[in-house]
Amino acid sequence: MKEDSCLQIGGKSFSSRLMVGTGKYTSSEVMLESLANTESEIVTVAVRRIQNNQNGENLLEKIDWKKFWMLPNTAGCTNSDEAIRIAILGRELAKLSGQEENNFVKLEVIPDKKYLLPDPIETLKAAEILINKDFIVLPYINADPILAKKLEEIGCSTVMPLGSPIGSGQGLLNLSNISIIIENSNIPVIIDAGIGVPSEASQAMELGADGVLINSAIALAKNPLKMAKAMNYGVKAGREAFLAGRIEKQKLANASSPEINISIK
């Protein structure tokens, strides 16, 4: 059995392996209760949402940033230049919220408006520049093992391959590539986007992912508070299963009660 440890990102330790987003909730009250139910420690915030004042200031004031670590994201950026500018704004927001040492950024560069698929070239370009500016970069990418390795090599602190398109709830569509990324990676692998139900979160963790990031599946559930708890349980169960080690698959049946040294009189 493997030994468990805390999730380590950029020199910080986190007990929870479930990261959560703050968008799409029906109210800030539902969001806050859902965040509490997930027991998450890392919360993503869309910097552009705050910049455009779409309830952004209210969001910053509502969340207790002594309890949660802010992960500013560059959602809405379509090229590397935009992403770099928004990342710098995000770092300032974290400082204004009391997290002076927070250099984290979830890097998203998405020019594709229909499927919201990330641009690998612009992501790699932005990541390299942000790392040189002392950011802890968590890049959102397609499930591309080669890109994931290149991002690791230039100094990214995690890679965040998508399970399926953002908000689609389609689950993990490319298990093979995700497994390769996990196998080859020396940094945490966080599955981001597409998870719809706790069993899919558990599946990601069973594969050996270091964590998952979930937003839509909780916020858009019929009962977000219950789904938040369920996702928490799913991530924990999947992690325990990974550490325990699954039974080997076999072509033939193997009786659980073998008839060995049993005498019948």
Swiss-Prot record:
Catalysed transformations (reactions): [ThiS sulfur-carrier protein]-C-terminal-Gly-aminoethanethioate + 2-iminoacetate + 1-deoxy-D-xylulose 5-phosphate = [ThiS sulfur-carrier protein]-C-terminal Gly-Gly + 2-[(2R,5Z)-2-carboxy-4-methylthiazol-5(2H)-ylidene]ethyl phosphate + 2 H2O + H(+)
Among its keywords, does the record have Magnesium?
no
Pathway it works in: Cofactor biosynthesis; thiamine diphosphate biosynthesis
**Biological process according to GO:** thiamine diphosphate biosynthetic process
In its keyword annotation, does this UniProt entry include Glycosyltransferase? no
Keywords from the named record: Cytoplasm, Schiff base, Thiamine biosynthesis, Transferase
The compartments listed are: Cytoplasm
**Pfam families named among the record's database cross-references:** ThiG
Output the Gene Ontology cellular-component terms. cytoplasm
Q: What is its EC number?
A: 2.8.1.10
Which residues does the Swiss-Prot or TrEMBL record annotate as the active site?
A: K106 (schiff-base intermediate with dxp)
- Give the Gene Ontology MF terms in alphabetical order: thiazole synthase activity
List ligand-binding residues for 1-deoxy-D-xylulose 5-phosphate.
Answer: G167, A193, G194, N215, S216
* Group of enzyme by EC: transferase
- What is the recorded function of this protein according to its Swiss-Prot or TrEMBL entry? Catalyzes the rearrangement of 1-deoxy-D-xylulose 5-phosphate (DXP) to produce the thiazole phosphate moiety of thiamine. Sulfur is provided by the thiocarboxylate moiety of the carrier protein ThiS. In vitro, sulfur can be provided by H(2)S.
The text of the family note is: Belongs to the ThiG family.
Protein name (Swiss-Prot/TrEMBL): Thiazole synthase
Q: Which gene encodes it?
A: thiG
